[in-house]
């Protein structure tokens, strides 16, 4: 199941530093994390759906690239985002 418009707006308002800053790394990572969670649940039920598994790997890869960019640019924002999203460490 994909993310609803209301859920996406809630994520944007929660993680954006400005009112409608949808392009910030924090917002993009939050939306990707939500999509990854939904797709993980789908892949657990439909374990032979290899196209969705590939899509899941692509989403994880793009989130990893965004997080590594943020880690290089601003370590404090990176650690705050990791803690808020509940990712590693």
From Swiss-Prot:
Biological-process GO terms, alphabetical: translation
GO CC terms, sorted: cytosolic small ribosomal subunit
Pfam assignment, any one: Ribosomal_S15
InterPro entries cross-referenced by the UniProt entry: Ribosomal_uS15, Ribosomal_uS15_bac-type, uS15_NS1_RNA-bd_sf
GO molecular function: rRNA binding; structural constituent of ribosome
Keywords: Ribonucleoprotein, Ribosomal protein, RNA-binding, rRNA-binding
Function of the molecule: One of the primary rRNA binding proteins, it binds directly to 16S rRNA where it helps nucleate assembly of the platform of the 30S subunit by binding and bridging several RNA helices of the 16S rRNA.
Family according to the record: Belongs to the universal ribosomal protein uS15 family.
PANTHER family for the chain: RIBOSOMAL PROTEIN S15, BACTERIAL AND ORGANELLAR (PTHR23321), SMALL RIBOSOMAL SUBUNIT PROTEIN US15M (PTHR23321:SF26)
Subunit-level organization: Part of the 30S ribosomal subunit. Forms a bridge to the 50S subunit in the 70S ribosome, contacting the 23S rRNA.
NCBIfam families, per the entry: S15_bact (TIGR00952)
Protein's name in the database: Small ribosomal subunit protein uS15
Organism listed in the record: Orientia tsutsugamushi (strain Boryong) (Rickettsia tsutsugamushi)
């Amino acid at each position: 199941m994909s993310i609803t418009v209301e859920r996406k707006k809630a994520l944007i308002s929660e993680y954006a530093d400005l009112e409608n800053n949808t392009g910030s790394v924090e917002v993009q990572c939050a939306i990707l994390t939500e999509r990854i969670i939904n797709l993980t649940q789908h892949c657990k039920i439909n374990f032979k759906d290899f196209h969705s598994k590939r899509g899941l790997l692509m989403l994880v890869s793009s989130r990893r690239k965004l997080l590594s960019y943020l880690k290089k640019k601003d370590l404090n924002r990176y650690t705050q985002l990791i803690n808020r999203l509940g990712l590693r460490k």
